[in-house]
Amino acid sequence: MRDQFICLALLLCALHSACGLYFHISETERKCFIEEVPDETTVIVNYKVELYDPRSNGFMPSSPGIGMHVEVRDSDDKIILSRVYSSQGRISFTSHTPGEHVICMYSNSTAWFSGAQLRVHLDIQVGEHAIDYANVAQKEKLTELQLRIRQLLDQVEQITKEQNYQRYREERFRHTSESTNSRVLWWSLAQTVVLVCMGFWQMRHLKSFFEAKKLV
C-alpha cells in the first residue's frame, strides 16, 4: 500500500511539470521550444529579458525599447498566438488539440539595440502547475480544506487528460505502423510482379532469339 502511494505521488509530480531555464539570443535570432500538451490544457509562459552591458561585463534589466515577439503553433501547425510583448511578462494560452506545441521567441529588432546580446529567463508551466491557487482561494474564498480538494480534483482531471493523450499517441503510432506495413507489403508485391514480368519477357525474347537462329 505504501509503495502504491509513493508511485502515485511521483506520478502526480511528474505529469505536468514546470521548467525554468535561461538562454542567450542575439538580434533577429529565433529560439523555439516544443511542449507536449494534452487538449484543453492551460499553458503559462513567464519570461524576463536582460541586456548585456559590456561596461560591467554582465546582464542588466533591459530597457523598455526591447521586447519579445512570441509565436505559438499547435500540433496542426496553426498559429494560436502571435504578438509582441514587453521585456518582461506572462503569456497564457489554452490548447485545443493534443500534441506538440511549438513556442518560438525572438527580439523585436530596433536600430538602437541592433546586435545586442540578450539573456532570456523562461519558465513554462503546464496543467495544474499553471494555476495560481493562492489567487483562486482568495477570489472564491476557499478554506484550506476546500482548496486542497480543489487541487486534488484538478490533479485527477490532469491525469485523465494525460491518459487520453497517451491513448491518442498510441492510436497515431498504431495507425502509422499499419500504414507503413501496408506500403511495404504493396511495394514488395509490386517488385515481385515486376520481376515476374521481366522474367517472362526475357524468356520470350530468348525463345524468339533461338528460333531466329534456328537453334530450337
Curated annotation (Swiss-Prot):
Signal peptide region: 1-20
Lumenal side: 21-182
Pfam families: EMP24_GP25L
Sequence motif Prevents secretion from ER, location on chain: 213-216
Family annotation (SMART domains): EMP24_GP25L (SM01190)
A cellular-component GO term for this protein: endoplasmic reticulum membrane
Its job: Eca and bai are essential, though not redundant, for dorsoventral patterning of the embryo. Specifically required during early embryogenesis for the activity of maternal tkv, while the zygotic tkv is not affected. Involved in Golgi organization.
Protein name: Transmembrane emp24 domain-containing protein eca
Gene from which the chain derives: eca
